[in-house]
Amino acid sequence: MSNNIGKVVQVIGPVVDIKFANDELPNIFNAIHIKMDDGKILVCEVEQHVGDDIVRTIAMEATEGLRRGVEAVDTGAPISVPVGECVLGRIFNVLGKPLDSGAEVNNEEKYPIHRPAPSFEEQSVVPQMFETGIKVIDLLAPYQRGGKIGLFGGAGVGKTVLIQELINNIAKEHGGLSVFTGVGERSREGNDLYYEMMESGVIKNTALVFGQMNEPPGARMRVALTGLTMAEYFRDQGQDVLLFIDNIFRFSQAGSEVSALLGRIPSAVGYQPTLATEMGALQERITSTTHGSITSVQAVYVPADDLTDPAPATTFNHLDAKTVLSRSIAEIGIYPAVDPLDSSSRILDPRVVGEEHYEVASKVKHILERYKELQDIIAILGVDELADEDKLIVARARRIQKFLSQPFTVAEQFTGMQGRYVPIKETIRGFKEILEGKHDNVPESAFLFVGTIEEVLEKARTMAQ
């Protein structure tokens, strides 16, 4: 730590102004340590040089009890957090301090949370599909290795279970690791997630980082970078890492909270003028390199369901795929409740996934769209009034809809059904056979909550006995 000492001259909520000697102003993003009267160390981050040898900083913790005249020490470096195997199975805050009841992490290896994005030479330019083992995602809205996925869904439609299954699958099938970052999260949800992960056994392959809803905006604004930094270390070690950010909207929201206090003139809808820059700095670091990959799943809250709001609109620019969870699908008992028509992916392209995959996915979507159109007629007149061709479409669409369901490993204790990981080849083969009419005589209920098409036939034989 440097001997550069300044004094607090102004405190406005989370924004603290500190005066230093003329020739020793700390750099932008440097961490400043302020010793409070109760002995605690308050960490602030330099955001601006405002003139008269004063730097404007954002506090990462509550500023209650802070007063003018207190000494502030420039650490000479940005906030640094522990990285490596020691973070797995643990919960951290924005500063890399443990929040669980475990031991202190005295890891020598630390990374600064502000790091440049990988250079063009380091980045992997070949788009590759990332197999999740979840049929509906792999077939209709496949994830890109090193891509960014938006997860849209309201309360109670299965976001958390889907997140846990992805963590479980990447750990078991790919030997990969996960970092979960709660940005502006409810403490209760973070608590629930931790204990559910402990029960399902995936916690040992996961690091959890939280900046909760009740924390100052500085912590909520930087906690996404803390989680990303931990993920970057594993990527650089050659791992495939899954990074969850819940919720990416809160990252923008926290930035707008401090923006006015930093003296910036608000932009559209009151957001910070630097919204696109801040989002870009975060998102550009989430990428594949020649060593490994970070695949990011980001929950996106849409204020007042307005997709043109600057915060979600800025996020959309960076997404490669979107997975939409639908309440109407959850209500008919199909889980995961992924909407097959609303969900989409940039890499659902024959040049990336192959001709067969693309063709099967297109036909599945076409049949489901036609079934949706016919539902109004069925509701008024009944199925019997349809033309024979449409009756066949309805029969196959219902089988497809049910076959898109799947038992999850992390939900075994609730469902009593053993979880299934379905390789993409099996997924394509199963749906192709349904489209070709090979299973038109198999009862619809046999397609519900199974893995491969063989299991459908086995289930049908059991039902017939």
UniProtKB/Swiss-Prot annotation:
Pfam families assigned: ATP-synt_ab, ATP-synt_ab_N, ATP-synt_VA_C
UniProt key word Translocase: yes
Binding residue positions for ATP: G153, G154, A155, G156, V157, G158, K159, T160
Protein name according to UniProt: ATP synthase subunit beta
Organism this protein belongs to: Clostridium perfringens (strain SM101 / Type A)
Catalytic activity: ATP + H2O + 4 H(+)(in) = ADP + phosphate + 5 H(+)(out)
SMART domains for the chain: AAA (SM00382)
Oligomer and partners: F-type ATPases have 2 components, CF(1) - the catalytic core - and CF(0) - the membrane proton channel. CF(1) has five subunits: alpha(3), beta(3), gamma(1), delta(1), epsilon(1). CF(0) has three main subunits: a(1), b(2) and c(9-12). The alpha and beta chains form an alternating ring which encloses part of the gamma chain. CF(1) is attached to CF(0) by a central stalk formed by the gamma and epsilon chains, while a peripheral stalk is formed by the delta and b chains.
Topology in the lipid bilayer: Peripheral membrane protein
A GO cellular component entry from the record: plasma membrane
Family to which this protein belongs: Belongs to the ATPase alpha/beta chains family.
Any GO MF annotation of the entry: ATP binding
Keywords: ATP synthesis, ATP-binding, Cell membrane, CF(1), Hydrogen ion transport, Ion transport, Membrane, Nucleotide-binding, Translocase, Transport
Tree of life domain: Bacteria
EC number per UniProt: 7.1.2.2
Annotated function: Produces ATP from ADP in the presence of a proton gradient across the membrane. The catalytic sites are hosted primarily by the beta subunits.
PANTHER family for the chain: ATP SYNTHASE (PTHR15184), ATP SYNTHASE SUBUNIT BETA, MITOCHONDRIAL (PTHR15184:SF71)
Annotated localization: Cell membrane
NCBIfam families, per database record: atpD
Transmembrane segments: none
